[in-house]
C-alpha cells in the first residue's frame, strides 16, 4: 500500500507577505472543521492587535505639543508692524529713465574746504615739511627733471602754504650767503676732525 503525500499549504510554512495581505483575509486561513494552525493563530492575533484601541500617546508627542504651544505664544507676542513681507530690491534696477519719470537724485557732497578742520599752524607746517610726495618732487626739480603740470601746481601750492605759515608763526627762512659760507669754511680747524 502506497502512501499518498499530503500537500502542505504555503500559508502553514511561510510568513505572509504584505502584498498578499490585501488579497487573503485571516478568515480564509481557517479550515472548516479542524483546529487553527500556529501560523493562522498568529495572523489572527496580529489582526486583532491592529483593531484594538491603542492606549497612550504617540512617541515624541511631548516635544511636538510644546513646539505648538511655544509657537502660539510667540505669535501672540509678535508686533504686527515688524517683519514686512514686502520685497526690498538689493540692486538699483534703473539709471535715470526720463521717459518713465524715474530719476536718481544726485548725492550732495560737501566741499573739501569745509571738511578740513583748521589745524594748528605749527602742526600743519610740520606735516607739509615731512610730506614725502612733496620732498620727492622737490628733489626731482633740483636734479633738473621735468614734472607734470599737476605736480608743478601741487608743489607751488605747498610752497605758498609753507610761506604763509612761516609768516604767521614769525619764522624767517635764513639763507646764508656764499660769503658767510666761505668765512665759516676758513675758520674751521681741520685738525679737529682727525
From Swiss-Prot:
GO terms for molecular function: GTPase activator activity. It comes from the Bacteria. Residues 37-48 have a biased composition (Basic and acidic residues). GO terms for biological process: ribosome biogenesis. Pfam families: YihI (PF04220). Keywords: GTPase activation, Ribosome biogenesis. Residues 1-87 are annotated as: Disordered. Belongs to the YihI family. A GTPase-activating protein (GAP) that modifies Der/EngA GTPase function. May play a role in ribosome biogenesis. Interacts with Der. NCBIfam families: PRK05244.1-1 (NF003560). This is Der GTPase-activating protein YihI. The lineage of its organism: Bacteria, Pseudomonadati, Pseudomonadota, Gammaproteobacteria, Pasteurellales.
